[in-house]
Amino acid sequence: MAKLYFYYSAMNAGKTTTLLQSAHNYRERGMRTLILTPKLDHRAGSGVVASRIGLRADGRIFERDTELQQLVERDIHNDGALHCVLVDEAQFLSRAQVWQLSEVVDRLRIPVLCYGLRTDFRGELFEGSQFLLAWADELEEIKTICHSGSKATMTVRVDAHGHAVQDGPQVEIGGNERYVSVSRAEFKKIMRGEGRIDPLQIALPLPVA
């Protein structure tokens, strides 16, 4: 039975790597997949989904007003049977788009695998994550580690001096080196201004296609 899955984590936990491996597993078995990526995420180039360890694949761009069920139906009409839809940076989905993806599962009987952050640098839910947590059939945390050794569940945005940034837009694409995954306890400390934190998780260079 097809299901809606949400794989969530803090920053730099390997979400995109996991997505690309899942897509590869489907293709290896002769099954066709569709990878969706938000237009505002163009770090690896428009329509390219790339992980920090160098894996990459072409994706179909969507915007905030893209009707995703219709997009999937057009893809099937043009290219034939589809066996899985995978969504990168799923936190940027709108409420309506999460519902549309649930329709892909329930009406078209196609599994949908969404990968994204749960919370932003203020510890608040993204819109897409909020409704995926509410409506997904299966939830799975992709774990990563805080510099303290505890499980990292939060993401902080730091300035050039390693101090927490508490204001600014929720969405800031690029500059991944400014984000650090930390435990809840460490998140509280740095947000209180107790010390500084180095952005240790530097993105690896992507290979040239």
UniProtKB/Swiss-Prot annotation:
It catalyses: thymidine + ATP = dTMP + ADP + H(+). GO terms for molecular function: ATP binding; thymidine kinase activity. It is an enzyme of class 2 (transferase). One of its GO terms (cellular component) is cytosol. The active site is at E89. ATP binds at S9, A10, M11, N12, A13, G14, K15, T16, D88, E89, A90, Q91. GO terms for biological process: DNA biosynthetic process; thymidine metabolic process. Signal peptide: none annotated. Its EC number is 2.7.1.21. Keywords: ATP-binding, Cytoplasm, DNA synthesis, Kinase, Nucleotide-binding, Transferase. InterPro entries: P-loop_NTPase, Thymidine_kinase. It is found in: Cytoplasm. It comes from the Bacteria. Belongs to the thymidine kinase family. Homotetramer. HAMAP family: Thymidine_kinase. PANTHER family: THYMIDINE KINASE (PTHR11441), THYMIDINE KINASE, CYTOSOLIC (PTHR11441:SF0). NCBIfam families: PRK04296.1-5. This is Thymidine kinase. It comes from Xanthomonas axonopodis pv. citri (strain 306). The gene is tdk.
